[in-house]
C-alpha cells in the first residue's frame, strides 16, 4: 500500500484529467506498493493516454460514429427473439432491438425489468418470493379453478388453499375484489366463491367469467411473469428477479426492491421516473449490451454516447428519424435528403426558408466543401513584420 504524498498529489492535481480519472489514479496508486517516482510516472502515463484519446479539432465525429455503429450492424442477426441468458424470458435482441432504441419506441416489443433486492431479501429465497408475489400479477386462474353452473346461473370459483397461503392472499380478500370489480353479490364459503348475474342470462354469465379472468388480485397488472434466479455477484450470491412486462415506477416503490440498481429496458419509463440523465444512461447501456450479445463489444462506447447525447440533448427523448432529430434539422436540404423529399422542399418554398449550408449533407448536395476537417480551415497569406510580431501592412 502506498501513501499519497504531497509530490504525488501535486502531480495528479496538475494534470488535465477530469476528477473521476484523478480519483481512479489515487485509488490505483494506493492499492499498489510503488515509490513516489513510479506513482508520478503512473499519473503522467494516464494523462498522456487521456490526451491521446481526445478528438482532434474539426474531426467529423458524427460520421465516424455512424460508420462505427452501422458497419458492425450489418453482421447482426435478424432474430427478434432470443434467450438473453435468462431461462424462459424472451427478449428482443440483435438488429430489431437496435432499431427499437434509435427509433425511441414508446413500448419495446418485449418490455422487461431486472429487479435487484435489498440485503434483507437478496439472500433469502422465501423473502425474495414475497417480493415476487408483490410484483407478478396474480389472476384468478393462478389461484384456483373457475366453472359455471348453468342450471343455477352461477359462476363457481374453487380456490387452492396452498396457493393462497403461498401468495399471501385470503379467500375473503378475493371475494371482496370480485364484488367490487364486477358489481355482483358474492357468496363465500371457505375457499369456494359463488356469484351470478342479477337477471338470469347465459350471455351475461359467460361475460362475467371473461371479466373475472382479467381481474388482478395482487401484484402489478403490466407484469405477467417473474423469474427468480440466484446469480454470482462481487461479494457472493444473491437472488435477482427478471420480469416479463414492465412498470418501472411501481416496482421502485415495492418494499424489498433495491431502487438504486433495478433497471428497465423501456427508456421512456426510465425517463418518466428518473429523468433525462438516467434515460441517457439506459440508452447507452442497452445499446452496448445489444452489440456485446452479438459479439460486437469492441465498438467504442463513445460512439454510442454521442448518439445518446443527441437523442436527449433537448431534455426529452427524441428518435433518430423523420419524426425526431432528422426531421427537425434547421437545414431544408438535410431534411429533404432524409425522407419525404418533395414535402420538405414544397413546405420550405411556401414559407420562404433559407438554407445557410452549415452542415455536412447540404454542402455535399450543392457540391461545396464541407465545414469539417481541412474544409473549415482558412489560410491567410501575408508577410511577417521584421520583428516577427504580426502581418505586414
Swiss-Prot record:
Pfam families: RNA_pol_Rpb1_5. It is an enzyme of class 2 (transferase). It is found in: Cytoplasm. One of its GO terms (cellular component) is cytoplasm. One of its GO terms (molecular function) is DNA binding. It catalyses: RNA(n) + a ribonucleoside 5'-triphosphate = RNA(n+1) + diphosphate. One of its GO terms (biological process) is DNA-templated transcription. Keywords: Cytoplasm, DNA-binding, DNA-directed RNA polymerase, Nucleotidyltransferase, Transcription, Transferase. Signal peptide: none annotated. The keyword DNA-binding applies. It comes from the Archaea. Its EC number is 2.7.7.6. PANTHER family: DNA-DIRECTED RNA POLYMERASE, DNA-DIRECTED RNA POLYMERASE III SUBUNIT RPC1. Belongs to the RNA polymerase beta' chain family. DNA-dependent RNA polymerase (RNAP) catalyzes the transcription of DNA into RNA using the four ribonucleoside triphosphates as substrates. Forms part of the jaw domain. Part of the RNA polymerase complex. This is DNA-directed RNA polymerase subunit Rpo1C.
Amino acid at each position: 500500500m502506498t501513501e499519497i504524498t504531497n509530490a504525488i498529489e501535486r502531480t495528479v492535481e496538475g494534470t488535465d484529467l477530469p476528477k473521476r480519472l484523478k480519483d481512479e489514479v489515487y485509488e490505483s496508486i494506493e492499492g499498489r506498493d510503488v515509490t513516489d517516482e513510479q506513482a508520478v510516472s503512473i499519473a503522467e502515463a494516464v494523462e498522456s493516454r487521456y490526451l491521446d484519446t481526445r478528438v482532434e479539432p474539426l474531426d467529423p465525429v458524427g460520421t465516424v460514429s455512424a460508420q462505427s455503429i452501422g458497419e458492425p450492424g450489418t453482421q447482426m442477426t435478424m432474430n427478434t427473439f432470443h434467450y438473453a441468458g435468462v431461462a424462459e424470458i424472451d427478449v428482443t435482441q440483435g438488429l430489431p432491438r437496435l432499431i427499437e432504441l434509435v427509433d425511441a419506441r414508446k413500448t419495446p416489443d418485449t418490455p422487461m425489468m431486472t429487479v435487484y433486492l435489498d440485503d434483507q431479501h437478496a439472500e433469502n429465497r422465501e423473502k425474495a418470493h414475497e417480493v415476487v408475489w408483490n410484483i407478478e400479477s396474480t389472476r384468478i386462474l393462478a389461484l384456483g379453478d373457475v366453472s359455471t353452473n348453468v342450471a343455477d346461473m352461477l359462476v363457481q370459483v374453487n380456490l387452492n388453499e396452498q396457493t393462497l397461503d403461498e401468495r399471501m392472499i385470503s379467500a375473503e380478500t378475493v371475494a371482496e375484489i370480485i364484488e367490487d370489480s364486477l358489481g355482483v353479490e358474492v357468496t363465500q364459503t371457505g375457499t369456494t366463491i359463488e356469484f351470478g348475474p342479477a337477471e338470469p342470462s347465459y350471455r351475461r354469465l359467460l361475460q362475467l367469467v371473461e371479466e373475472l379472468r382479467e381481474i388482478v388480485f395482487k401484484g402489478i397488472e403490466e407484469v405477467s411473469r417473474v423469474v427468480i434466479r440466484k446469480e454470482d455477484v462481487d461479494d457472493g450470491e444473491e437472488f435477482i428477479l427478471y420480469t416479463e412486462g414492465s412498470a418501472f415506477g411501481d416496482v421502485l416503490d415495492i418494499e424489498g426492491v433495491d431502487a438504486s440498481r433495478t433497471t428497465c429496458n423501456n427508456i421512456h419509463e426510465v425517463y418518466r421516473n428518473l429523468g433525462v440523465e438516467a434515460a441517457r444512461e439506459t440508452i447507452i447501456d442497452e445499446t452496448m449490451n445489444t452489440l456485446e450479445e452479438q459479439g460486437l463489444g469492441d465498438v467504442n462506447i463513445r460512439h454510442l454516447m454521442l448518439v445518446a447525447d443527441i437523442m436527449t440533448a433537448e431534455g426529452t427523448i427524441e428518435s433518430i428519424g423523420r419524426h425526431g432529430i432528422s426531421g427537425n434539422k434547421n437545414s431544408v436540404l438535410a431534411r429533404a435528403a432524409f425522407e419525404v423529399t418533395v414535402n420538405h422542399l414544397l413546405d420550405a418554398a411556401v414559407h420562404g426558408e433559407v438554407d445557410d449550408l452549415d452542415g455536412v449533407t447540404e454542402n455535399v448536395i450543392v457540391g461545396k466543401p464541407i465545414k469539417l476537417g481541412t474544409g473549415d480551415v482558412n489560410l491567410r497569406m501575408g508577410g511577417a513584420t521584421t520583428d516577427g510580431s504580426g502581418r505586414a501592412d
